[in-house]
Amino acid sequence: MANIVRSFMAERILKGKLEKINRKDVDVSSAGLIDMDGMPADPIAAGILNDHGFEGSNHHAQLLTEDMASRADMIIVMEDIHRKMMIEQYPDAAGRISLLKSFSRDYNEAYGDIRDPYKLSMYHYRLCFSEIYLSIDGLIKCI
């Protein structure tokens, strides 16, 4: 929601996986629904990315703008509440908004959210990374 943990991790994982398969035609960025005014990425999230071979440095939170939403071919969110907020704020984008976990092989609508690990245990950060990582495999098949 603030673009310092989940969306940041998803952006970096997606960019890394697309680079490995030489998909240079896809532009990936992340933004939050709360203005954190350039706050750096959560250091635990950045460390987990680095540990798995993804770029974890040089990220600062940015707020999603109307221009970003209107230009995006796909808008991927982490929780259903985010999807609902986005549809309310950007109704023209409704058909382009999806839950990241809906691309997962094991998707179950009842458990479609990727929970925010911010300020929780390392276990929660690792679980979040795993859910994002596996969901992105499915997302790439749809791009």
What are these regions (language model features)?
Residues 74, 80-143:
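Phosphate-binding/catalytic loops
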